[in-house]
Amino acid sequence: VMQYSGTADFQARFQRLNEFHERVIKNFTAYLVPQIELSASTSKEAVCVVFEKVNTGGKALDAFELITAMYAADGYELRKDWFGTEEGEGRHGRLRAAMRLPSAAEGVLSGVGNTDFLQAISLFHTRDLRESAKGEGKTGRELPQVSATRQVLLNLPLDAYKQYQHRVEEGFLSAAKFLIQLDIYRVKDLPYQSQVVPLAAILAELGRDADSPAAIEKIRRWYWNGVFGELYGSSTETRIAKDFIEVVDWVRGGSEPSTVRDATVRADRLDTMRMRLSAAYKGVNALLMNRGAEDFRSGQTFSHTIFFDENVDIHHIFPQDWCKKTGISKQVYDSIINKTPLTARTNRIIGGVAPSEYLARIEGDGAEPEEVNSRLRSHLVDPALLRTDDFESAFRKRRNELVALIEKAIGKPVIITEPPEADGDFDEDPTEIEDLGSDAL
């Protein structure tokens, strides 16, 4: 102001300065910063809730973020553990790459999040607290619960994290190996992401005890009962904790875990498995591949075709176009009973024609009829019924074969019931007309 006080245009310049002060400077000097005061007794879970309520950016303050802040107060950088640094890969990267196929960008554990990892550690920590309380003579309700809830995570001490982090990571890596052995190679084929947490914790706790054939058989039974009983779909925290304790005890000679006892599988569920997002739907696909199903055209097992990234997906055995023309109801032909894993190339050959016609195409490329019959049987498809386009008989027989396959996996009978009434959940399969790649489905 003093610099321009004697100039001819002082008034104009002064007016501009006033405008700048009013419109810019005052916005800074008069800005009110909101402040929320929380008492020292406020629980960590309540802090998260308050943050989520007032945060207009939409960023959730999840358990990992709050635990990161808690550990930082003790000089420990949890984010570096998980995400890594320029100098080295973090735990997230190692899990994401675990058992990754050469043709894939990520492995079967790519869906494991930081909260999943903390949950597994929490199972060990709360188990230790419970055992310690038992040693002090406490019983019944006096004993703390083994738990992996959000509230428990927010009280996970740094010492417990340091104690179990490497053991739990090894458990997740063992879980990846376990899933690969079940022919579950990709995260999109994983029935339940939530079931990976107790699986990793169980394998971490058992260590080499999990390697015996008897132990592997029990863990597999537990896993498939969880999948086909559809017990990990929602509200899983209690089941995760129970399974961690009960499956380990079962492997070491105890009684059957509640997941194995609770699982109820009905035959009519096969008729309503139509959506690719269904855990049981994915489970049937994995069981078929695990029993050695071979591609109709190439005769390769699906461990090989997935390894070489040949776009394996689940497709109709009796093509949907043919079914529509024949007058078969969508609720019938769209179920998992009429679907099986096939490569995209084989599915293009199948197209929308009658099975007898596409089998002739396959054999026209040089495959012997008995070779093709063997491949069909590997999918639990009756060759004679498929060759005569007998949908009803083939459908009924394959339903029975799939029931037997599931019974073998879960180690107990499936409840036999009549097929249900129609519902509205269907899958479209555009690749029967034109291959769009498995990622388009």
Language-model features, listed with the residues they occupy:
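Intrinsically disordered, low-complexity N-proximal targeting/linker segments that flank membranes
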Residues: V227-I314, W322
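Short Cys/His-centered divalent metal-binding micro-motifs
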Residues: S335, K339-G364
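Basic- and aromatic-enriched surface patches that contact anionic nucleotides/nucleic acids
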Residues: V1-D128, R186-V187, N225, R361, ...
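A cross-family structural signal marking well-folded subdomains
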Residues: E65-I67, A105-L270
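Acidic, carboxylate-rich catalytic segments that either coordinate divalent cations
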Residues: E230, K242, P383-L441
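Histidine-centered nuclease catalytic patch
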Residues: T305-N338, A354
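Short conserved micro-motifs at the rims of enzyme active sites and ligand-binding pockets
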Residues: K44-C48, L129-E136, A210-D211, L231-Y232, ...
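Conserved structured core elements
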Residues: S41-C48, A60, N155, K162, ...
